[in-house]
Design a protein with these regions (language model features):
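Polytopic transmembrane helical bundles with strong interfacial aromatic enrichment
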Residues: 1-124
C-alpha cells in the first residue's frame, strides 16, 4: 500500500481538525456549550498525528526532514492536548493555546508539502 498517501490524508485530517478546534474554541469562549466537540476533535487530531508518525516510519522513507516533521507535529499536538486538559478552567490559557494552534496549522501545511514531494519521488 502507498503509506505516504495515507499519511497525506491524515495530515489533511489534522488541518481540518485544527480549523474545527479553532471554531469550537472561539464558540466556547463566546458562551456556547461545545466543550465535548472541542475535546473529541482534539482526540481525533491526536490519533491522526500518531497515525502520521506510524505511516511515515512504515513507508521506510529515508527523508529525515519528513520523519522529524511528523514527530514534531505529533509532539506539539500532544503538548497542546495536555495544556487543554490541564488548564481547561483557566481562560488565560487560551492565549497560549491559540498561538500553539496556529503553529500546528502552519506545521501541518508544511508537512503536506514535504509528504507530497517525497510521494512524488517514490511514485516515479
Amino acid at each position: 500500500p502507498d503509506l505516504l498517501k495515507f499519511a497525506k490524508i491524515s495530515t489533511m485530517l489534522v488541518i481540518v481538525a485544527t480549523i474545527g478546534q479553532a471554531s469550537t474554541g472561539l464558540a466556547r469562549n463566546s458562551g456556547y456549550d461545545v466543550a465535548a466537540s472541542h475535546a473529541y476533535a482534539a482526540q481525533l487530531g491526536l490519533v491522526a498525528c500518531i497515525a502520521i508518525v506510524a505511516l511515515v516510519i512504515m513507508s521506510k522513507s529515508e527523508n529525515k526532514k519528513l520523519k522529524g516533521m511528523s514527530f514534531g507535529l505529533a509532539t506539539i499536538w500532544l503538548i497542546q492536548y495536555g495544556l487543554g486538559e490541564m488548564f481547561s478552567g483557566m481562560t488565560w490559557i487560551s492565549l497560549i493555546h491559540a498561538v500553539i494552534a496556529m503553529a500546528i496549522f502552519g506545521h501541518a501545511l508544511a508537512l503536506m508539502r514535504v509528504i507530497a514531494a517525497e510521494h512524488a519521488i517514490h511514485s516515479e
